[in-house]
Structure formats: C-alpha cells, structure tokens
C-alpha cells in the first residue's frame, strides 16, 4: 500500500465496526478522500481528537483497494469554538455537508478546501454575522464546482435579463435568471427582487472575508434563502439534514 500526505478538514464522520471511525477529509492535495481511523472511538486513542468534525489536520494515509487507512495525524486547528456554539456549529456543519454532497471523490481542486478553511475561521469569530457568510460560501462553492448561477444573462437565451416590476424571474433548475421572453420555460421559477439579485451578485463576486458587512434580514434574507435552497436542491437532488436543522434554529431565533 502506498503512503501519501495531505492537509485536510474533517467534513464527515461515522462509526465503523466496534471501535473505529470512517472520516471524510476535504484535502488540499487530493480533493475529497475517505479513510478509516482504527480505534478512534476509544477516548485515549491517538486519532480520537483529530477525527472530530471541522478538525483541520495534517495526515498520513495508506492507500487501500476500497478504503484508505489513517496512519498518522496532527491537529493544526481543532475549531473547538464552533463545536461550543450551537448556532455557529449548525452553519459550519451545513457547509461541510454541502461540500460533501457536491464534490466527487478524488477531484483535485484546491479552491473548495481553501474556501471551507477560510469560512470555518470566519464562523469562529463571534462578532461576524454568520448568515451572509453562508450565502457567500454557497455561491462561491457552486461557482468553483461548475454550478455558477447566471445572475445577469438569461439562462434560456443569453440576452440581458431585464427586470419587470422591480424584479426578475429566477429558475433554479435551469440555472439562473430569465428574460421576459423565456419566463414560460422556467418551471418552478421564483421571483427575485432587484435588491436580492444585487445582493447575490455582491456575495458571489466579493471577498468572503467582507461578507459579514452585507446586511441580510427580513424578506431580503428569506428571498435569497428560497432561491439558493431551491438551486442547491436541483443539484444535490436531496435535502440536506444539516440544512433542515439550521432552518429550525433560525426560525426559533
């Protein structure tokens, strides 16, 4: 079996056999990889702390036929502060599940790794609003993976999506906004106000470290949530449990 080294973030963990864990890492070098951590469910095991969700690690793995094996691991950043704050933990958990749902295994692409790592650090800062950061994360991740929504040109014909009555039609399945002539083609299309559209553009193209400066509240936040939730559902083809939990938390605040 070949050995290889990675910098990675734990994005999913599940129990395996009597005392092991299977961890999914989003890595800088290899993309998304899955490995077994022997004995990691035992409290004093050398892998126990490093295999918690969100952990940023440097790891050495054995490459196996069907499943790789964790050989050595060093914690770079535990992101303990995220696990100690229920709301911020919910945002970060959803981000990890979204990466896991959208990214195929072994697709070597550094950008999603760097995006998630930066976002985890930002969610860990208590003075930052986690909501606009999440929307920026979703939009940027989609764009990196080839799912960039069309927010200016009509996704049906390519012409400029002229606003009507202060908004445009957004077709989640087709992949973006529609011009008046193509509106009938967009099954399940949603209305987006001009404010929501411009906010999405700003979050998509702006620096994610400044996303917290975008104010999202009330109907504007609800509009963007409906649009992006439908857009992501059309690509994952399943509802993410962590998103449902996050929605429950937000509705109770």
From Swiss-Prot:
GO terms of biological process kind: DNA recombination; double-strand break repair
Any one Pfam family match given in the protein's UniProt record, by short name: RecO_N
For this UniProt record, the keywords arranged alphabetically read as follows:
DNA damage, DNA recombination, DNA repair
Q: Which domain of life is it from?
A: Bacteria
GO CC annotations, alphabetized? bacterial nucleoid
Signal peptide coordinates: none
What the entry lists under InterPro entries is as follows: ARFGAP/RecO, DNA_rep/recomb_RecO_N, NA-bd_OB-fold, RecO, RecO_C
Entry's family note: Belongs to the RecO family.
What function is annotated for this protein? Involved in DNA repair and RecF pathway recombination.
Q: What is this protein called?
A: DNA repair protein RecO
